[in-house]
């Protein structure tokens, strides 16, 4: 006996659009939570200073992550996706570097070595990793344009 259709027929492009939309939402959510966490923690790090305080750098990360989240959701262009990926990759890389390596003061950047894990830092790693994966998907899995026959 033939199986009954489970719903209306779908095109391959519908699935791709859904996955890209989900990736955009995940990227924006990860970047949005990253922005919130950095803004929330900034005051605690104002005392760690050189020329620039670590709190100021946290506020800068919060602003960049918020802008990246908006670009991924609203602008939806490769350049915006690239900016979002750079913010996510850069933020995650710096967090891990300063967690595991004591690089000291770098010019105006204070010594941000912090060899401990705590809830907000763990959450930041998770949301930044989600944003990295989602934005890399957006950059690498570009939709195909019409093919010449």
How would you name each of these model-derived features?
Residues 2-149:
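Membrane-interface extramembranous regions
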């Amino acid at each position: 006996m033939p199986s009954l259709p489970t719903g209306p027929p779908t095109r391959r492009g519908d699935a791709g659009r859904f996955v890209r939309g989900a990736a955009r939402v995940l990227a924006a959510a990860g970047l949005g939570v990253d922005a919130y966490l950095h803004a929330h923690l900034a005051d605690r790090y104002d005392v760690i200073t050189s020329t620039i305080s670590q709190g100021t750098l946290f506020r800068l990360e919060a602003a960049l992550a918020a802008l990246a989240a908006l670009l991924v959701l609203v602008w939806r262009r490769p350049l915006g996706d690239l900016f979002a990926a750079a913010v996510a990759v850069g933020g995650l890389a710096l967090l891990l570097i300063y967690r595991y390596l004591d690089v000291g003061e770098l010019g105006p950047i204070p010594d941000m070595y912090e060899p401990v894990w705590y809830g907000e830092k763990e959450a930041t790693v998770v949301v930044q990793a989600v944003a990295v994966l989602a934005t890399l998907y957006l950059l690498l899995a570009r939709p195909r344009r019409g093919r010449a026959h």
